Amino acid sequence: MNPKQCAAQAAMKYVTSQMAVGLGTGTTADFFLISLAQAIKAGELKEIKGVPTSRQSERRAIELGIPLFSLAQCPVCDITVDGADEVAPNLDLIKGLGGALLREKIVAQNSKKLVIIADEGKVVSQLGSKSPLPVEVAQFGYETQEGFLRSLGAQPKLRVGPGGMVFVTDNGNCIYDCHFAGGIKNAGEIEAALNRCAGIVESGLFLGMASIALIGSEGGVREIRRG
């Protein structure tokens, strides 16, 4: 197994029968969905309720035969297992390069435990060192957000999809990918400023949310717990 698969498999020990499980989005989360589906088919896990974090994870769960439920049906998940684009030593995260940050955060904040699975390359000493920060904005007046994001020290770039068309999220919004020279030194302040601005729907800063990170490498999987 590759490091992502190893991390995904390690997360299975936190899942037991009758759990409501938040189903993450992305390549690493997909390995978890495969492992979860195999355990369900083998009868090792029973009465699992999968809560998808995107249309992508919803489609994948249907393909794999994972029973799906909405947040209205499962307002509190026992656990969510998801990937991350960056993992800081204190388990603060950047997520959202796959475009599902809003739904991922909604499901995560309605979960008793958020378990992050990633490979060693996603571990950073400071958020923003490698990955841009995705910021989801309403389509109405989205052009006006660029100046505000620059005022926070970011170098924003509007995300475009295939054919050069503006990328649109599952929720009908746009995304600015924001690079910060030297990384994000004041993540809490940046998050607070973003939350105050009308038209900014959500950011990929997941601060104080993860309980455990399982980091896969060629040498195995190491577990990091929030202190």
Language model features by range: what are they?
Residues M1-D82:
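N-terminal active-site beta-alpha-beta segment that forms phosphate/nucleotide-binding
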Residues N2-Q5, R55-G227:
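Conserved phosphate- and dinucleotide-binding cores of soluble alpha/beta proteins
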